[in-house]
């Protein structure tokens, strides 16, 4: 049996849960902090994240919405370059705002480079999520 790895990032954002949820589930807002997309918060919806193509990568991440629990949990598949993973966002209201937990699971033992790249990328994306959420009214 192959054991997979998960990447987990947790940060408390000083914003109400509803604002964070909007930034996670509205396509134009997702584009501002993550990538261009055709996301819709509907279970079963197949969509793509699109970024600038690079050598050996067409810039497309194939995804499907798996879970939508408004203001609580969002999950979608994340398939690109041989990585078949699942991203789960969990939101919990705190006295200071919202605890945001992102887990990307499914990294195979030989996907160390992909794991490290995802860790770097999600740190940057969280910065963008914070910025976009701060700008919401």
Predicted regions and their residues:
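Hydrophobic ligand-binding cavity/cleft-lining segments
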Residues: 1-38
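A conserved amphipathic terminal alpha-helix motif
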Residues: 2, 105-137
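Residues at helix-coil transition
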Residues: 25-26, 70, 127, 134
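Hydrophobic-ligand binding "helix-grip"
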Residues: 38, 46-48, 53-101, 105-107
């Amino acid at each position: 049996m192959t054991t997979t790895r998960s990447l987990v990032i947790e940060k408390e954002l000083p914003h109400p849960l509803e604002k964070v949820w909007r930034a996670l589930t509205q396509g134009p807002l997702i584009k501002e902090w993550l990538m261009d997309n055709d996301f819709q918060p509907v279970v079963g919806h197949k969509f793509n994240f699109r970024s600038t193509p690079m050598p050996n990568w067409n810039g497309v991440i194939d995804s499907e919405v798996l879970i939508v629990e408004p203001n609580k949990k969002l999950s979608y598949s994340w398939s690109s370059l041989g990585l078949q993973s699942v991203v789960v966002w969990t939101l919990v209201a705190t006295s200071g705002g919202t605890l945001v937990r992102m887990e990307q699971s499914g990294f195979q033992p030989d996907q160390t480079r992909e794991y490290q790249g995802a860790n770097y990328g999600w740190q940057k994306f969280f910065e963008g999520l914070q910025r976009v959420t701060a700008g919401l009214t």
